[in-house]
Amino acid sequence: MANIKSAKKRILIAERNRLQNKAYKSAIKTFTKRFQAAVDDYKSNPSDDQLAAIQNEMSVTYSKIDKAVKVGVFHRNTGARKKAGLARILKAAT
């Protein structure tokens, strides 16, 4: 354990940031799974409504990834790679 006041503060800040980063990453994983489920539903029974649902899920997931990159949870290349993976899944389904 640190003895210096500023080091103690940094420990608290690092823990706070770790929990915030974990929440961002968890949310992105959840939205990615929802997107994948929407794509699977579309594959089994294609319709315009399900395609709209896929687009909506993709938009929400993209926005979460962009926000995570903006606040520094992900590097911009990691965010781009995750978004490209989603686009690849969508292209394979349609």
Swiss-Prot record:
A GO molecular-function descriptor: small ribosomal subunit rRNA binding
Highest taxon in the source lineage: Bacteria
GO biological process: translation
Any one of the GO CC terms: cytosol
Record's keyword annotation contains Ribonucleoprotein: yes
Keyword vocabulary terms for this entry: Ribonucleoprotein, Ribosomal protein, RNA-binding, rRNA-binding
Residue runs in coiled coils: none
Family the UniProt entry places it in: Belongs to the bacterial ribosomal protein bS20 family.
Protein role: Binds directly to 16S ribosomal RNA.
Record HAMAP family: Ribosomal_bS20
Protein name, per record: Small ribosomal subunit protein bS20
